[in-house]
Amino acid sequence: MHNLIPNVQKTMEQSFIAYIENSIKNNWDLDALTDYKGATLQYKDVARKIEKLHIIFEESGIRKGDKIAVCGRNSSHWGVTFLATLTYGAVIVPILHEFKADNVHNIVNHSEAKLLLVGDMVWENLNESAMPLLEGILMMNDFTLLVSRSERPVSYTHLTLPTIRL
């Protein structure tokens, strides 16, 4: 019976990714995520941003099962980061943006996250030296590199993605 568990998990993971992929394909030109009084991302925009994050994760050495922390206000980019992390096969570590900096540091350290994506309001209160296990910290709204402790590049703000044909 215990041999079924990995197969069930793999099937559920594949189903989730297929569900996201099909949603994007079937709604390509429709609105997907909107910030309150802000920009709206269509499904095609979400797909391109997910692809960009996947490239950043790969180039950063993130592997399936690695942890990626995210701490910022609810936004379309928070949603994109969440979807990109899960579809990449990494584990998302969501942290409430209302937490005090010490609590954020403790959660990041305890989770053994390799990357942290933060919102600008959160970043101004954090101390990167209090999170020594992180390999990189990126700004959530545009994926720019804030801190890198790796020889690997972790941000590609200049990256232009190819046109995705679905």
Model-derived segments and spans:
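Active-site-adjacent beta-strand anchor residues
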Residues: K10, Y36, C71, L116-G119
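Flexible, non-catalytic linker and terminal segments flanking ANL/adenylate-forming cores
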Residues: M1-Q14
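Hydrophobic/aromatic residues within well-ordered alpha-helical segments
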Residues: F16, S23, K49-I50, A130
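Conserved small/polar residues in nucleotide/adenosyl-binding loops
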Residues: T157-T163
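Conserved AMP-binding/adenylate-forming core of the ANL superfamily
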Residues: E21, D29-L83, K100-H105
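Structural core segment of the AMP-binding/adenylate-forming
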Residues: E59-S60, T87-P153
